[in-house]
Design a protein with these regions (language model features):
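A short amphipathic beta-strand at an alpha->beta junction
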Residues: 36, 56-78
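Short edge beta-strands and adjacent turn/loop segments
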Residues: 3, 7-32
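Short amphipathic alpha-helices in soluble, non-transmembrane regions
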Residues: 5-8, 44-52
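A sequence-level detector of short, solvent-exposed, charge-rich linear segments
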Residues: 24, 28, 47-50, 67, ...
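Non-catalytic alpha-helical coupling and interface elements of nucleotide-dependent molecular machines
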Residues: 14, 38-39, 49, 53-61
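N-terminal start-of-chain detector that recognizes signal peptides
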Residues: 1-6, 37-40
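A short interface-forming secondary-structure element
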Residues: 25-47
Length: 78
């Protein structure tokens, strides 16, 4: 289920990366999002919460969701 949630989160406008961490019972422990600067973190957070509830029937405390914004539209790795 982790991969399907991550793939769905990638459909959110401005999101360029996502990682979902679940415990052994399938409960979401952490969500990490990387986005560009076109939308505010608050807007992205609300979209994440809405998708989790509407598509996956999971409610997550907003404190478990972290959003890092980067300039540009991709994360560079070296």
């Amino acid at each position: 289920m982790t991969k399907s949630i991550e793939q769905f989160l990638m459909k959110i406008q401005s999101v360029i990366g996502s990682k979902v961490i679940m415990d052994s019972n399938g409960v979401i422990e952490e969500i990490h999002i990387v986005s560009d600067l076109r939308r505010s973190p608050k807007q992205i957070l609300r979209d994440v919460e809405a998708i989790l509830i509407s598509e996956f029937d999971q409610s997550v405390d907003y404190k478990k969701i972290s959003i890092a914004q980067v300039k540009g539209d991709s994360v560079k790795t070296e």
